[in-house]
């Protein structure tokens, strides 16, 4: 028994399922999860000391790589002054100014402690501002585990084969409408059915919780137009895509302007953090200036703000996103080339520092129903083959992969050579 396996058995005695977030349990791929001891650059190291090239990156935040010296130095410097104050700090102001300078649609921003808090708060604000109850989300998209959002959700709930979760009253769920991602007609149908009831659309601009699904041309702008037509707010959930797809997020990359934006992951540099922001007239509706209540004991935590600021400043380096996109393209297209070489059907998607691959004969994947038709068993075999080769991918066929600036020529070469060997063995065994 490995030390990771022993720790997993020990953890299951005191932690439900042995993990603190379901996808980590490896239910989507089988076997026991790795317990991680440390990480540096493009590598993570398990409890047995084995190194892995990491394409999870703590589920997105580690865009510069693990244990980056500038972020580590910023955290250590902040710790010298104390861990938490429950009062305003200059760091919060600096972080707000930095976010606003990078995302033109954000005129004011409120810091919170997680992505779920950000989306939950943004939806409450949208409902309060419009005085409407219903929200519209998309099948296969995930926006955290708030009751109103865990309705036909993707991500962990989808991996577990549960389209929604017990514990959510029907009275909550009835206010959440679900449309088809990349299908404007399904959105318009719902708005025509409830023309004055829908407060907002919330969307992942690149769906990263049904693997990686970019928007088709015109889709995001079409949503913007429908919101304007019916008087609803548009919320772009950039918890995953914010500052990972481009310096101004997916909204900048695709040229669409939302009313509200949610952020997380990258803006914390690896620390727990979230944020929501947008139009000033909407943001002024939040307490203490407005009637919509939102609060948090650790919101704007100085350690998280310090780590996030260091990362955000580093992301302003010229040419960084072009280099990151080139790395991502190489990995995604390298996987596809290896699969083609060995006669294994595969489709790929990638944008910015995100990528996805699908074992399928479908030529392209643009919708949730297509994702569910992919070969999950082939993914599981490939996953464990890559793990044995020292490559750590997301342990679910429904999660995106992430590149970092720390992934260099050597790491990419080793990854693609490993993929070639694993796919060759899969073909030989078929």
UniProtKB/Swiss-Prot annotation:
<dbReference type="InterPro" id="IPR015424">
    <property type="entry name" value="PyrdxlP-dep_Trfase"/>
</dbReference>
<dbReference type="GO" id="GO:0030170">
    <property type="term" value="F:pyridoxal phosphate binding"/>
</dbReference>
<dbReference type="InterPro" id="IPR004639">
    <property type="entry name" value="4pyrrol_synth_GluAld_NH2Trfase"/>
</dbReference>
<dbReference type="GO" id="GO:0005737">
    <property type="term" value="C:cytoplasm"/>
</dbReference>
<protein>
    <recommendedName>
        <fullName>Glutamate-1-semialdehyde 2,1-aminomutase</fullName>
        <ecNumber>5.4.3.8</ecNumber>
    </recommendedName>
</protein>
<keyword id="KW-0963">Cytoplasm</keyword>
<dbReference type="Pfam" id="PF00202">
    <property type="entry name" value="Aminotran_3"/>
</dbReference>
<dbReference type="InterPro" id="IPR049704">
    <property type="entry name" value="Aminotrans_3_PPA_site"/>
</dbReference>
<comment type="pathway">
    <text>Porphyrin-containing compound metabolism; protoporphyrin-IX biosynthesis; 5-aminolevulinate from L-glutamyl-tRNA(Glu): step 2/2.</text>
</comment>
<keyword id="KW-0627">Porphyrin biosynthesis</keyword>
<dbReference type="InterPro" id="IPR015422">
    <property type="entry name" value="PyrdxlP-dep_Trfase_small"/>
</dbReference>
<dbReference type="GO" id="GO:0042286">
    <property type="term" value="F:glutamate-1-semialdehyde 2,1-aminomutase activity"/>
</dbReference>
<dbReference type="GO" id="GO:0006782">
    <property type="term" value="P:protoporphyrinogen IX biosynthetic process"/>
</dbReference>
<feature type="modified residue" description="N6-(pyridoxal phosphate)lysine">
    <location>
        <position position="265"/>
    </location>
</feature>
<comment type="subunit">
    <text>Homodimer.</text>
</comment>
<dbReference type="InterPro" id="IPR015421">
    <property type="entry name" value="PyrdxlP-dep_Trfase_major"/>
</dbReference>
<comment type="similarity">
    <text>Belongs to the class-III pyridoxal-phosphate-dependent aminotransferase family. HemL subfamily.</text>
</comment>
<keyword id="KW-0663">Pyridoxal phosphate</keyword>
<dbReference type="InterPro" id="IPR005814">
    <property type="entry name" value="Aminotrans_3"/>
</dbReference>
<dbReference type="GO" id="GO:0008483">
    <property type="term" value="F:transaminase activity"/>
</dbReference>
<keyword id="KW-0413">Isomerase</keyword>
